[in-house]
């Protein structure tokens, strides 16, 4: 049963003190002794701790509090007085600490009513499942399943199920949970159906964190269930160290075509890193998908500059042009220097099959973009950059020519030769774009 503080005391506190926001409520998780200690204090007075960093009261928001379920068995709902002259609040990792708190309610974490209360707060289902798993509470899990379990695929749940345990409650809980989580598989063809059931054998499963390492292997993302609760089936699995699991048999319950823009938004909502999604669309020349991501999601300056590098080496003019406009707009929102992580050698090693190593160390971001654009082989991209960086192309002519020879791009070699001979000397440098690239000098390690 939920433990409630005397409402008369709460009313007195509300009348006597102001709050940062009377509608703002904070939470923390504590053990039984902590609850006893709090109730032994006079609740009509603020609870005071002199050493906040060491002894202060930690609290956080409702969306974060279940990250701390290992701290105890009780959920405290509390508020903080705002205008008490002795109040001190400091920010700490994942929350705050204060020398004063005012308690509203205490909930037992193993109670189904507490679980329902947290569910109504729209807490992430993965966190709610972690709470249910702490107590191996099938009633909580059933409640969540009835409401429509929405979980991000995570290979940890397969590992938990496959771990041998002597606790039958734990085995049943893990089996029920695993049978309800849709995992992901990437394939080039859609599976057929047998008596209305789509069964797939010998499948490599992945989770949301590792999905985009697999996308080059197909154009469909399958959602599959592992039939671990069917006693007439013997499911075989094999784990590796690269975020993949081989499973002998699964049921396909849905699929998405990667040509459909909406699947990318769905995967980001599931927890896919939006930068991984953006790089995938650039490398696979999905222009409309790239435009959608740039329009609907926020990328920081370093992410945009790295994306521009990949667009240059991919040789797609339309994608490159779209990104370069976004990068120019982002430049004026921050004075942040360009990251030394944008390293030419690193990009060439990971993104390009470079046949020969050239001893060359770029000094500006422009140098990197020019080299990558030449490797990408798009004459249109070089022509776009020409009106901004004519002099830089002249200065880098010899190194750019070496790269064009390595990649046997005759059109690129002819263009660079004509630029060097002055055939395009009437191009004027655009100072705005010039400042975007050249004020950011790279820090390179020799």
Swiss-Prot record:
SUPFAM superfamilies: Ankyrin repeat. This is Putative ankyrin repeat protein L273. It comes from Acanthamoeba polyphaga mimivirus (APMV). The lineage of its organism: Viruses, Varidnaviria, Bamfordvirae, Nucleocytoviricota, Megaviricetes. ANK repeats lie at residues 71-100, 124-153, 206-237, 245-277, 303-332, 365-394. Signal peptide: none annotated. Keywords: ANK repeat, Repeat. It comes from the Viruses.
């Amino acid at each position: 049963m939920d433990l409630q503080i005397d409402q008369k005391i709460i009313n007195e506190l509300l009348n006597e003190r102001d709050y940062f926001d009377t509608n703002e409520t904070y939470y923390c998780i504590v053990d039984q002794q902590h609850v006893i200690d709090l109730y032994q204090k006079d609740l009509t007075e603020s609870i005071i701790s002199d050493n906040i960093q060491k002894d202060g009261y930690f609290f956080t928001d409702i969306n974060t509090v279940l990250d701390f379920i290992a701290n105890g068995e009780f959920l405290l709902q509390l508020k903080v007085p705002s205008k008490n002259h002795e109040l001190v609040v400091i920010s700490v990792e994942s929350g705050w600490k204060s020398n004063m708190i005012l308690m509203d309610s205490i909930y037992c974490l193993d109670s189904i009513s507490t679980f329902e209360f947290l569910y109504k707060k729209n807490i992430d289902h993965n966190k709610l499942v972690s709470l249910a798993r702490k107590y191996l509470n099938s009633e909580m899990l059933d409640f969540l399943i009835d409401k429509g379990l929405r979980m991000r695929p995570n290979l940890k749940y397969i590992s938990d199920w496959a771990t041998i345990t002597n606790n039958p409650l734990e085995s049943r809980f893990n089996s029920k949970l695993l049978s309800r989580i849709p995992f992901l598989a990437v394939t080039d063809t859609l599976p057929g159906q047998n008596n209305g059931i789509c069964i797939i054998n010998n499948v490599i499963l992945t989770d949301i964190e590792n999905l985009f390492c697999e996308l080059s292997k197909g154009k469909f993302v399958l959602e599959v269930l592992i039939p671990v609760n069917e006693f007439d089936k013997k499911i075989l699995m094999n784990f590796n160290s690269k975020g993949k699991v081989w499973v002998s048999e699964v049921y396909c319950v849905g699929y998405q075509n990667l040509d459909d823009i909406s699947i990318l938004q769905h995967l980001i909502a599931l927890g896919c890193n939006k930068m991984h999604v953006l790089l995938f669309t650039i490398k696979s020349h999905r222009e409309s998908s790239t435009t959608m991501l740039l329009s609907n999601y926020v990328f920081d300056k370093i992410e945009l500059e790295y994306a521009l590098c990949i667009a240059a080496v991919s040789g797609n003019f339309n994608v490159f042009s779209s990104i370069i406009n976004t990068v120019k707009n982002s430049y004026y929102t921050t004075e942040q220097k360009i990251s030394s992580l944008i390293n030419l050698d690193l990009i060439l090693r990971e993104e390009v099959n470079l046949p020969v190593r050239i001893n060359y160390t770029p000094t500006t971001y422009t140098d990197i973009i020019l080299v990558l654009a030449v490797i990408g082989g798009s004459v249109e991209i070089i022509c776009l950059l020409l009106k901004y960086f004519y002099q830089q192309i002249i200065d880098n002519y010899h190194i750019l020519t070496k790269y064009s020879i390595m990649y046997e791009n005759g059109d690129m070699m002819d263009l660079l030769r004509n630029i060097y001979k002055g055939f395009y000397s009437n191009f004027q440098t655009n100072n705005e774009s010039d400042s975007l690239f050249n004020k950011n000098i790279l820090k390179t390690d020799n």
